[in-house]
Amino acid sequence: LSGANKGFDRVKGDQMGMLATVINSLALSSALVAAGVKARVLTAVRMEPIGEFYNKWRAIECMEAGEVVIMSAGTGNPFFTTDTGSSLRGIEIEADVMLKGTRVDGIYTADPEKDPTATKFHDITYDEVLKRGLKVMDLTATCMCKENNLPIIVFDMDTVGNCLLYTSPSPRDGATSR
């Protein structure tokens, strides 16, 4: 978005962001495979042989075969965030939960990297996230999760082992910090 303010084409910027998610997906896939975990990269834009083109049924088929499916390139469309892409894909495949890895260990009253007085929530409803204007995810992604009852778990992705900890959530309305 900052480049758009300087005259850069927003669509091209969003496409670069989509490509960056593919690069990250390839890195994650490589790390998983090196650890002995089957992994597959699916992309929202065609770019075989780098990754397979995403469709719901292929994603489910791969997961049922025991593979970790890494969905990349957001929705494949500009003007949609990766949060919205993740929410959309989670809803499509009827996921039990959306895991949001970030630089902080949960949801706070403000950005704890900028505000040392920020307080962490342990559980919070979607409505409260929206009412307080918390920047957990963008508005579209949060509303999609709310409307489709997709729980969100926010965790610190830089803490080793966190991804493995958050694979069996309990049912809840809204988002959880752990």
Predicted segment positions?
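Short, hinge-like loop/turn segments at secondary-structure boundaries
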Residues: 6-9, 57-60, 114-121, 172
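Acidic, metal-binding active-site segment of PIN/NYN-like and related structure-specific nucleases
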Residues: 41, 91-116, 153-160
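Conserved small/polar residues in nucleotide/adenosyl-binding loops
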Residues: 166-171
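Alpha-helix C-terminal capping segments
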Residues: 20, 26-35, 88-96, 144-148
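Gly/Ser/Thr-rich active-site loops/lids in small-molecule metabolic enzymes
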Residues: 12-19, 89-101, 118-131
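Polyanion-binding loop/helix "lid" in catalytic or ligand-binding cores
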Residues: 21-22, 29, 69, 73-75, ...
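Ligand-binding beta-strand-loop-alpha-helix segment within the catalytic cores
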Residues: 3-69, 84
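Internal active-site segments that recognize and position negatively charged phosphoryl groups
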Residues: 26, 57-109
